[in-house]
Amino acid sequence: MAGEKAEKPGTKEKKPEAKKADAGGKVKKAKKVKKGKPHCSRNPVLVRGIGRYSRSAMYSRKALYKRKYSAAKSKVEKKKKVRVLATVTKPVGGDKNGGTRVVKLRKMPRYYPTEDVPRKLLSHGKKPFSKHVRKLRASITPGTILIILTGRHRGKRVIFLKQLSSGLLLVTGPLSLNRVPLRRTHQKFVIATSTKIDISGVKIPEHLTDAYFKKKKLRKPRHQEGEIFDTEKEKYEISEQRKVDQKAVDSQILRRIKAVPQLQGYLRSVFALTNGIYPHKLVF
């Protein structure tokens, strides 16, 4: 009996340990957070990049209007603006004058102009077109072969000479190779290739400016008595100065082109895209 009594307290002591273990296990289970199953998008895709519902429709479908957004508090303290007084109260003498009067600090002008004169507004740093900064793409340097994308010479390869004061590019074919004369073009409408020619020794006339290439207005014929149907429109003719300048520039460049094999054929060829050729994958 004594042995049996000794065993009973031992069994009683084990029970609280088991309870403690169970309690600890329950605590551990409570810490675990069940993750929700990921569901598919509420906006089914019709075509790649285009969903069935619009942005405003998804706003109501997701009930985003129930969410409360709190703006982050800025740490910078706002300076209180000092209000400028528009009026001042001044004491006034006399028994029947009320004692004070409200006087405006900024008084209206006594006299007004009889005619409305337009007021000149400040430009706020705006500069005229002549004073704009002319930037040039890093890939376009003197001697770079460009591909023209617009105009009557589109697809042809030309040689870049210099940038004019207006920002336009001065290019030449040369004329004897691809029938492109000395002309101006915008850098937006050209593709710069990796092929280049050394034109450091080429002397370009200084009078080749924007005024030189500016289109001259042709005079319209005036109708006179008896010459209503006989009048002819004045046609544009290339000046002798242009022909001289074209030969002077091309003669210097042709020497350098002939020194490089297969460059003449490259400048004569016209750039075009065919089936299976993608411009964004080409290396110019």
Swiss-Prot record:
<protein>
    <recommendedName>
        <fullName>Large ribosomal subunit protein eL6</fullName>
    </recommendedName>
</protein>
<feature type="compositionally biased region" description="Basic and acidic residues">
    <location>
        <begin position="1"/>
        <end position="25"/>
    </location>
</feature>
<dbReference type="InterPro" id="IPR005568">
    <property type="entry name" value="Ribosomal_uL6_N"/>
</dbReference>
<dbReference type="InterPro" id="IPR049633">
    <property type="entry name" value="Ribosomal_eL6_CS"/>
</dbReference>
<dbReference type="InterPro" id="IPR014722">
    <property type="entry name" value="Rib_uL2_dom2"/>
</dbReference>
<keyword id="KW-0687">Ribonucleoprotein</keyword>
<dbReference type="Pfam" id="PF01159">
    <property type="entry name" value="Ribosomal_L6e"/>
</dbReference>
<dbReference type="GO" id="GO:0002181">
    <property type="term" value="P:cytoplasmic translation"/>
</dbReference>
<dbReference type="GO" id="GO:0015934">
    <property type="term" value="C:large ribosomal subunit"/>
</dbReference>
<dbReference type="GO" id="GO:0005634">
    <property type="term" value="C:nucleus"/>
</dbReference>
<dbReference type="GO" id="GO:0098556">
    <property type="term" value="C:cytoplasmic side of rough endoplasmic reticulum membrane"/>
</dbReference>
<keyword id="KW-0597">Phosphoprotein</keyword>
<dbReference type="InterPro" id="IPR008991">
    <property type="entry name" value="Translation_prot_SH3-like_sf"/>
</dbReference>
<feature type="modified residue" description="N6-succinyllysine">
    <location>
        <position position="90"/>
    </location>
</feature>
<feature type="modified residue" description="N6-acetyllysine">
    <location>
        <position position="235"/>
    </location>
</feature>
<comment type="subunit">
    <text>Component of the large ribosomal subunit. May bind IPO9 with low affinity.</text>
</comment>
<dbReference type="GO" id="GO:0003735">
    <property type="term" value="F:structural constituent of ribosome"/>
</dbReference>
<dbReference type="InterPro" id="IPR041997">
    <property type="entry name" value="Ribosomal_eL6_KOW"/>
</dbReference>
<comment type="similarity">
    <text>Belongs to the eukaryotic ribosomal protein eL6 family.</text>
</comment>
<dbReference type="GO" id="GO:0022625">
    <property type="term" value="C:cytosolic large ribosomal subunit"/>
</dbReference>
<feature type="cross-link" description="Glycyl lysine isopeptide (Lys-Gly) (interchain with G-Cter in SUMO2)">
    <location>
        <position position="5"/>
    </location>
</feature>
<feature type="region of interest" description="Disordered">
    <location>
        <begin position="1"/>
        <end position="42"/>
    </location>
</feature>
<keyword id="KW-0963">Cytoplasm</keyword>
<dbReference type="InterPro" id="IPR000915">
    <property type="entry name" value="60S_ribosomal_eL6"/>
</dbReference>
<keyword id="KW-0256">Endoplasmic reticulum</keyword>
<feature type="modified residue" description="Phosphoserine">
    <location>
        <position position="123"/>
    </location>
</feature>
<comment type="function">
    <text>Component of the large ribosomal subunit. The ribosome is a large ribonucleoprotein complex responsible for the synthesis of proteins in the cell.</text>
</comment>
<keyword id="KW-0007">Acetylation</keyword>
<dbReference type="GO" id="GO:0036464">
    <property type="term" value="C:cytoplasmic ribonucleoprotein granule"/>
</dbReference>
<dbReference type="GO" id="GO:0014069">
    <property type="term" value="C:postsynaptic density"/>
</dbReference>
<feature type="modified residue" description="N6-succinyllysine">
    <location>
        <position position="203"/>
    </location>
</feature>
<keyword id="KW-0832">Ubl conjugation</keyword>
<dbReference type="Pfam" id="PF03868">
    <property type="entry name" value="Ribosomal_L6e_N"/>
</dbReference>
<keyword id="KW-0689">Ribosomal protein</keyword>
<keyword id="KW-1017">Isopeptide bond</keyword>
<feature type="compositionally biased region" description="Basic residues">
    <location>
        <begin position="26"/>
        <end position="40"/>
    </location>
</feature>
